Amino acid sequence: MKTIFYLAFFYSAFSFAQVYEFLSTKNNKTISHRIILDKEYLIETQFIKEPAEFILTRGGYYKKKGKTYNIELEFNSNFENDGFTIIDLRKGKSWLKSQNKPIDLNGKWLMAGRVTELGERRRDITGPRKTMKFLIDGYFQWVAFNTETFQFFGSGGGFYTAEKGIYTENIEFFSRNNNSVGRILPFKYKVQDSDWYHKGKSSKGKPMHEIWTKRSNLISNK
């Protein structure tokens, strides 16, 4: 199913890494809309900041024609309700572009494995079940999904810093547990070749040592 959304935003020169935000109101609640994109991929997320409430997220590879982004969705957390697999986002007048500067970790990263007492345990990143983390100019979002079944397993995001070997996430929305919003999660990190290692504790307080790899290393079907 395809639908067209005439979303308004303040237009500025297109660049390959952007974050936009705007607000809307529904049932007396203020909804934050965030869109993060690079030269080929776009994620739209809607959430309420106070009190914290996750609404939806959806994203995929896009093509741009004029003022319209045509997105072939890889995931849609609201799929069971709306059935959308393709959407068009058209420029209007109310998005505000983030002025944050690019950070070295910018990009799409796939969960590639974990480091255990026995060494690295890698997972197959070519299958349909993926966990992806999208980092753009100090904003992050992770999404777990299945590209074949369109199953959505969860998502969370917010903003981050990466300085002197410490990567820190500030959670602004979390589909699985609104109580996680506001938490600050620091990790030790390093980038080695095209892998990003980070070590710390999850939002549940459990130790973790993860390996992420750039999605550009995987030939995708678009």
Regions found by a protein language model. Give the residues of each.
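Bacterial Sec-dependent N-terminal signal peptides
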Residues: 1-21
